[in-house]
């Protein structure tokens, strides 16, 4: 779930920040350099809010990711675990469908949270047509994480053909299909 989206320009001074929840982990992404003092302040705010809403005894788990060139030049890690832990394997559920995610590796976590409405549409479309005479066939021309394909199959599509950008996507698709008992 997208918790905060500063890049939309609705929060002046916060345009560089995005906060996503991949339960039980929060991922804070900055598109501009962030100082340790800023991260400490944000971490304290997250901890304060988490202590108010968390199930009893549940620790705050959060990761910071900087998506900018300055991090590579300075030699600092692009992605850092700031508090708690990240499960391995890390599996999240959206609308009853399970996905394996990787919040400590690169920019592609395995599920683009801002595409949830699109996945709902694909699910509803596939479910409504799953009993058609010939069955629904889906061509996914941008199968980056295969999440749309998993949703289509889960909703009753007869066949999905994926076009991948990289070989790694095949492994992601296979893991997600297995998690959802899809052959």
Residue ranges and their predicted role:
Residues 2, 61-65, 140:
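A structural signal for short, well-ordered beta-strand segments and their strand-loop junctions
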Residues 38-39, 114, 169:
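Hydrophobic (often cysteine-bearing) scaffold residues that line and stabilize catalytic clefts
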Residues 7, 12-13, 18-20, 42-116, ...:
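Non-catalytic substrate-recognition/targeting regions of SAM-dependent transferases
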Residues 123-183:
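Conserved SAM/SAH cofactor-binding pocket of Class I
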Residues 1-40:
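Polybasic, low-complexity RNA-engagement segments
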């Amino acid at each position: 779930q997208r918790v905060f989206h500063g890049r939309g320009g609705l929060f002046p001074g916060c345009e560089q920040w995005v906060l996503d929840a991949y339960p039980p982990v929060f991922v804070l992404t900055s598109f501009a350099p962030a100082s340790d003092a800023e991260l400490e302040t944000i971490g304290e705010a997250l901890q304060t809010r988490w202590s108010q809403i968390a199930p009893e005894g549940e620790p705050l788990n959060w990761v910071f990711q900087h998506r900018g060139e300055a991090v590579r030049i300075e030699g600092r890690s692009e992605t850092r675990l700031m508090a708690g832990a990240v499960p391995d394997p890390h599996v999240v559920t959206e609308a009853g469908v399970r996905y394996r995610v990787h919040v400590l590796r690169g920019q592609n976590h395995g599920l683009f949270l801002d595409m949830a409405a699109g996945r709902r549409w694909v699910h509803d479309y596939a479910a409504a047509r799953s009993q058609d005479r010939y069955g629904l066939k889906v061509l996914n021309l941008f199968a980056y994480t295969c999440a749309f394909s998993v949703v289509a199959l889960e909703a009753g599509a007869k066949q999905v053909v994926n076009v991948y950008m990289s070989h790694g996507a095949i492994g992601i698709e296979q893991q997600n299909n297995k998690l959802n008992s899809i052959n």
